[in-house]
């Protein structure tokens, strides 16, 4: 699926990606000499508020080994950005214990549906069961009152 490319936004993402990699100790420049690398990093750090100039920095100074990784990271970030705009494509995550996940997974397989669909089904069943239980309790109370009078 193709997503619209937003130059300013993506340049900011690229700058953040490169700075994070640099802070993590990875070589983000193509230079072997540390003084050249330090000068290039200093130039990159100055570009924080000028995101579109990051493209020129990438072309002139970035390590070739990082090129593909940067493209993949930006593509993934773009996908998450656009999917987050729509309620139905926005993803949420939850932490489950393994045994809970296993039970849910087995139930989803029995129902022939996804984990999300299984959760939705189980919640609606629990709600229906709760309403029925409340109705039975109410009927018992009414019957008790009727018999005691």
UniProtKB/Swiss-Prot annotation:
Required for spatial organization of the terminus region of the chromosome (Ter macrodomain) during the cell cycle. Prevents early segregation of duplicated Ter macrodomains during cell division. Binds specifically to matS, which is a 13 bp signature motif repeated within the Ter macrodomain. The keyword Ion transport does not apply. It is found in: Cytoplasm. This is Macrodomain Ter protein. The keyword Cell cycle applies. Pfam families: MatP, MatP_C. Homodimer. Keywords: Cell cycle, Cell division, Cytoplasm, DNA-binding. Belongs to the MatP family. InterPro entries: Arc_rbn_hlx_hlx, MatP, MatP_C, MatP_N, MatP_N_sf. One of its GO terms (cellular component) is cytoplasm. The lineage of its organism: Bacteria, Pseudomonadati, Pseudomonadota, Gammaproteobacteria, Vibrionales. It comes from Vibrio campbellii (strain ATCC BAA-1116).
């Amino acid at each position: 699926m193709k997503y619209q490319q937003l130059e300013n936004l993506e340049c900011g993402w690229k700058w953040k990606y490169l700075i994070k990699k640099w802070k993590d100790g990875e070589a983000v420049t193509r230079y072997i000499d540390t003084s050249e690398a330090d000068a290039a990093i200093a130039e990159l750090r100055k570009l924080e508020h000028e995101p579109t100039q990051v493209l020129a920095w990438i072309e002139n100074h970035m390590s070739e080994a990082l090129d593909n990784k940067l493209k993949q990271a930006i593509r993934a970030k773009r996908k998450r950005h656009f999917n987050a705009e729509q309620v139905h494509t926005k993803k949420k995550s939850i932490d489950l214990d393994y045994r809970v996940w296993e039970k849910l997974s087995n139930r989803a397989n029995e129902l022939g549906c996804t984990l999300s669909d299984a959760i939705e089904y189980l919640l609606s069943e629990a709600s229906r069961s709760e309403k029925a239980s409340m109705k039975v309790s109410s009927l018992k109370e009414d019957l008790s009152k009727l018999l005691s009078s």
